[in-house]
Structure formats: structure tokens, C-alpha cells
Amino acid sequence: VYERDAAITMELIPSTDELIFFNASTDPYTNNNGGIMLGENQETVDNIIGSANYDIGHVFSTGGGGIANLNSPCSPSEKARGVTGLPTPIGDPFDIDYVAHEMGHQYGGNHTQNNNCQINPGTAVEPGSASTIMGYAGICSPNIQPNSDDYFHIINLREIADNVTYGTSSTCFEEVVSDN
């Protein structure tokens, strides 16, 4: 979705496996508290990987929902502050409605739904709970559909492009020239 819609390619770092914890009693995360996990993830990724060795970090849990710092890639103290949690973290709803949504905040995207749930007046351009990635499809009435479609609204693409071109996240992206 990010590559197709926003021309952003993400690559896993070679030492990603060092950030996978199999023992809940020894891992550094508070599974059911996304707010606390934001700081825990920043500290953990920086300590294990090193701040200079990655541009964006995101942690997954089996807790509920998600939370992320806005415009955080490339920012040394915020770039790993993204959390996505769901009791059953599998399938398209998890990948699109939660992971792509929370990473959308990290890249600079605000909510697009026009209802009473987490509304952002400047980007509330979709009816009801919205239907694109940065909306709340199926989460908060009036629901237009049960899950998000797998694309960004143009208003979010503009926000993301502005952030990675001119904003906080512009400092670490590499432009690749294409023959297109």
C-alpha cells in the first residue's frame, strides 16, 4: 500500500530478529498498554538496533487498538513510537485497518472520518466512519462499511508527501530516480 500509493518502500533491517521476543516474562513490553509501549519500543529498538540504523519502528501486541506519534520517521526520539495491537493480529483487517493506519499516523496522516470519534476537523473529509485507511471504518458509527479499503484518501497522501518531502521525516529518505 505504501509503495503503490505514496512511493515509500520499507525494508526490514538485517537484525530484525533481535526484536522478536518469545518469552512474555522477559520481553520489555507492557502488552496491553499502547501508551506505555510507545516509550518501551523507542528505548528497546534504540538499545538493540541503534538509533542511526533505522528510520521507522513499530511494535505489535495482542492488546487492543493502536497509537502512534505523528510525523515520527527519522526523528531520533520518536521514530519507533508506533504501536498496533489486536487480540488476533492476522489478516487484512489487522494489516490495513490497524497497522497501515497507525503507520499512516507515523508518516503524517490524520484521521479522515467525519463523526464524533477522534475527529480531526481539517481532514474530516469522508462521510461517517470513512472507508479509506486513515478512517475508522467499522469502529465508530455511523459506519459506511465494516473495514477500510486498502488505499489512502488524497488528503492523507498530501500530508504524507509533505512530511517526507519537507517535514520532520524528510531527513532520512533516499530519493530513487526512476525511468518512468
Q: Where do the language-model regions lie?
A:
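Extracellular (secreted or membrane-anchored) zinc-dependent metallopeptidases
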Residues: 1-180
